Structure formats: C-alpha cells, structure tokens
C-alpha cells in the first residue's frame, strides 16, 4: 500500500512539473509571437480640449524623450503616425531592455492628444505609477514606464 502511495505521489509531482514547464513555454511563446496590431481596446470618455484653459491647449506634444534607461537622452520627433515601442527591430523606439516585450506599447495621436496603450506585454506599461490597461491619454511631462525605460512627451 505504501509503495502505491509513493508511486502516485511521484507521478503527481511529475505531472505538476510538466504542467509548470508547459505554462512557462506558453507564456514565452505569446510574448515572442505577440500580434502586431489588432488589440481590442475599451475606450473611455476623454476630456475635450474646449474644457481646458487656453494656455494648456497651446501645449502640443512635439517630441518623445527617453528620460531613464539605456537610451536616456534619445529624442523622437512626433508626427501623425503612431509610435510603436518594444524590442522588435521594426519598432519606432527599439528598446534594449530585458523587461520590455517585443511589441510592448503604442503611442497613438488622436487630434492634438496622445494616448498610450499596452499591447499585451508581460511586465505591463505604467503611466505615472498606474498600470495601463486600456488606451489612456498621456499628459505632457507625465512619465511612461516600460520596463526600466521611462519616456515623456515634451512640447
């Protein structure tokens, strides 16, 4: 009887070990082969520019600046195209950060405002210490943390 219990315990332990290995490989696979677009985003209500004072409306983000991390000091001039951020070679801002995913986040313009959205990254994207779960408006000067890299929008 004791031999049977010992054998069942060994088999159960091996099954748990293989289940753990399978889940780790599945997570790595989804991070490596993450979709390039087509991310479902719930849109919230945005504050319209007409409600802001005139002096705040004049400040339009024109540059993306890396303030912390390996690429500190890097500046990207913003246009009308979204900025893809991640470790992929075809990203607009290619990060050499171990905590960043291949396709980590996207900064998208909507009128004169910029929104950040996480593209299903493993470690998440943070705006002012708050985790980004949907497309969120990025105020000028607010830190956006992607792994060890921090970026800001500047006028």
From Swiss-Prot:
Highest taxon, organism lineage: Bacteria
Membrane disposition: Single-pass membrane protein
Alphabetical list of InterPro entries matching this protein: Cell_Proc_Reg/RNA_Proc, FHA_dom, SMAD_FHA_dom_sf
Entry-linked Gene3D superfamilies: 2.60.200.20
Free-text description of this protein's post-translational modifications in UniProt: Phosphorylated by PknB. Dephosphorylated by PstP.
CDD domains: FHA_FhaB-like (cd22693)
Phosphothreonine: modified positions: 36
Occurrences of domain FHA (ranges): 83-132
Annotated transmembrane regions: 6-28
Keyword field: Cell membrane, Membrane, Phosphoprotein, Transmembrane, Transmembrane helix
Subcellular location: Cell membrane
GO cellular component: plasma membrane
Name of this protein: FHA domain-containing protein FhaB
Taxonomic lineage from the root: Bacteria, Bacillati, Actinomycetota, Actinomycetes, Mycobacteriales
